[in-house]
Amino acid sequence: VSLAIAAFQNGHTVTVWDISQQIVDAILRDGEHKTKLPGVKIPKGIGFTTDPVCMEHSDMVVFVVPSLYIRSVAQRVKPYLDENVILVNASKGLEEKTFLTMSQVIQSEYPDNAVGVITGPSHAEEVGRGVPTTVVAASKNEAAAVQIQETFSSHTLRIYINTDPVGCEIGGALKNIIALAAGICDGLHCGDNTKAALMTRGIHEITNLGVKMGGRAETFGGLSGIGDLIVTCCSMHSRNRRAGILIGEGTSPSRRPSGLRK
């Protein structure tokens, strides 16, 4: 929804598709997403629907769904998209078994489309409130990266372009492991020295693995690498860090909030 607001404020026609009629009805009734973005008013000009036909004739479609469902959603909406639409991934993770990044999954389903990524140190809660934020728009197709940049940029959302989407996504996926460990450090009250060491060695390991997986080393020193790692290891918006804190404190899985049990 935060990206939808950003694009709408730049003069674009925006429709948000969701599989849940209950969520769509609640947003239309309340004028905000009280679960994900409480207090952030959504402009009335943004459409919300459960009908995927809304994607027909779109210039750009952004996937903002849990990584587990990226492939199934990409397959589900395929009848409504042609080869001219730019497909953008905004989810973080790797596909189970294949270890493909989310943009690679999308590209495998849409081999003829330009596919890009928008990623970096950005919590939706802050983007939606207009907190100054900087992220990366990445694509092997530089023109597509520029189009993503122009669609969402604002005076509070600065977007840099990059031609290494794989490296950008690997940084965004693997930092969650380090953030969980950082939370455990906090839960154990290990101190700043320990956490700094963990984060520093963590980005080193992410870089080494990321290069082996096809990313460029310099990518991991930027917003989608060290930047995303810092915000995820230090923010209470981060579910991985919060889960790590509970583990470090010895809280049993059954007593953790439902979203932090796994």
State where each predicted segment sits:
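Rossmann-like NAD(P)(H) cofactor-binding subdomain of soluble oxidoreductases
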Residues: I42, F48, V53-P132, I148-E150
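N-terminal loops that bind phosphate or other acidic moieties
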Residues: V62, T194, L260-R261
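NAD(P)+-binding Rossmann beta1-loop-alpha1 motif at the extreme N-terminus of oxidoreductases
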Residues: V1-V40, T49-T50, R76
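Cofactor-binding loop segments of dinucleotide-utilizing enzymes, especially the Rossmann-like FAD-
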Residues: I19, K92, K140
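NAD(P)-dependent Rossmann-like dehydrogenase/reductase catalytic/cofactor-binding core
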Residues: A182-D186, V211-G221, G225-K262
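Generic structural signal for residues in well-ordered beta-strands
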Residues: V14, I46-F48, V115, I159, ...
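Internal alpha-helical scaffold of NAD(P)-dependent oxidoreductase catalytic cores
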Residues: Y69, Y80, V105-N113, P132-T219
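Alpha-helix C-terminal capping/helix-to-coil transition sites in glycosyltransferase folds
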Residues: E56-H57, L174, I226
